[in-house]
From Swiss-Prot:
UniProt source species: Pelodictyon phaeoclathratiforme (strain DSM 5477 / BU-1)
GO molecular function: RNA binding
CDD domains, alphabetized: Terminator_NusB
GO biological process, one term: DNA-templated transcription termination
Domain of life: Bacteria
UniProt name for this protein: Transcription antitermination protein NusB
Alphabetical list of SUPFAM superfamilies matching this protein: NusB-like
Gene3D superfamilies: NusB-like (1.10.940.10)
A cellular-component GO term for this protein: cytosol
Purpose: Involved in transcription antitermination. Required for transcription of ribosomal RNA (rRNA) genes. Binds specifically to the boxA antiterminator sequence of the ribosomal RNA (rrn) operons.
Amino acid sequence: MKTYRRQIREKILQALYTIEIRDTDIDSAAGWLLTEEILADPNAMKFFNMLLKNIKEHMEEIDRYIVKHTFNWDMSRIAIIDKNIIRMALTEILYCEDIPPKVSINEAIEIAKKFNSTDKSSKFVNGILDAIFNDLKNEGKVHKNGRGLIDQSVTKLQKVEGEGENPESAS
């Protein structure tokens, strides 16, 4: 499954781009982009279907987050590719419990570099996603489990540093 995740993200990005420039639905646009390798791998198809389903179901909510964090920008002025990369990453952050947010953000940055709609696409995508992620985390809206847990290493470090210390005896 890991082998195909970036490829699947890129195919879904292409489908999202297609629906913005043509009069078609996302299922049709995504369906013709699938490769035989993806179709033959049940785990890859599971990831594809899950990501596509969540994007479709939550696009309006995702777009509200984007609008809130793109000050002085109208959604129509944001490059189509950049906007859809952000949509996809936010969908993963909010609705894919097993994918760490940092992985979703990093994948979005790498895809932005590859598709490079503008010279500053990867920086724009990174800035918007980072701002939205920080707000979502502060609002308690990011729910992860298993490998998707956030700040796991920080929590472990705090536990180790705090062991055996008595705050009252420190004075």
